[in-house]
A protein has these predicted regions:
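Thiol/disulfide oxidoreductase modules built on the thioredoxin-like
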Residues: 83-91
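Short beta->alpha junction loops
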Residues: 68-74
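Non-catalytic, surface beta->alpha helical segment in thiol-disulfide oxidoreductase systems
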Residues: 97-132
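Structural motif
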Residues: 74-81
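N-terminal leader/targeting and pre-domain segments
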Residues: 1-36, 132-138
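Local sequence-structure signature of Cys/Sec-based thiol-disulfide redox active-site neighborhoods
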Residues: 24-68
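Cytosolic beta-strand hydrophobic patch enriched in CBS
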Residues: 42, 93-96
């Protein structure tokens, strides 16, 4: 599979790099805080059927999750763009398990079906509770 190239940071002017780093930083901080505080986090938007489907699949699987919504197709697109730039994931939903991005609807449903979502959450949860630290292991 061919991979998409990523622009080398050396090819971004300092002023542009600063603009990228400060673009809706408060939104990214909110997502980072939720990921640190909750085992499973779904980042999405209103009216998006893929977000709705992944939330339904998690509910049906009995997986508790924190949901963060940023606008709809008609609002808050810049906030969603900041999240996409931060995570590198191009679409919504974005699902995180114990701090690890597992993907969107398709990959989340596959992880539910094959048990890897629950396994990841439980394996890491036990490692964290046994050590008493918040270190993330994959």
């Amino acid at each position: 599979m061919k991979t998409r190239p990523v622009l080398d940071p050396k090819r971004i002017a300092p002023a542009a790099a600063e603009k990228l780093r400060s673009f809706h930083v408060e939104v990214v901080d909110e997502v980072v805080a939720a990921i640190a505080a909750h085992a499973v986090v779904v980042v999405g938007m209103a009216q998006n059927p893929h977000v709705k489907n992944v939330r339904k699949a998690l509910n049906e699987a009995g997986v508790e999750f924190q949901y963060l919504a940023y606008g709809s197709y008609f609002s808050e697109w810049k906030k969603r763009l900041a999240i996409k730039q931060w995570s590198g994931w191009p679409t919504f939903p974005q699902v995180f398990v114990r701090g690890v991005l597992i993907g969107g609807e398709e990959l989340t449903k596959a992880a539910i079906a094959d048990g890897t979502l629950r396994e990841r959450a439980e394996r890491i949860e036990h490692a964290v509770s046994a050590s008493g630290s918040a270190a993330v292991t994959a």
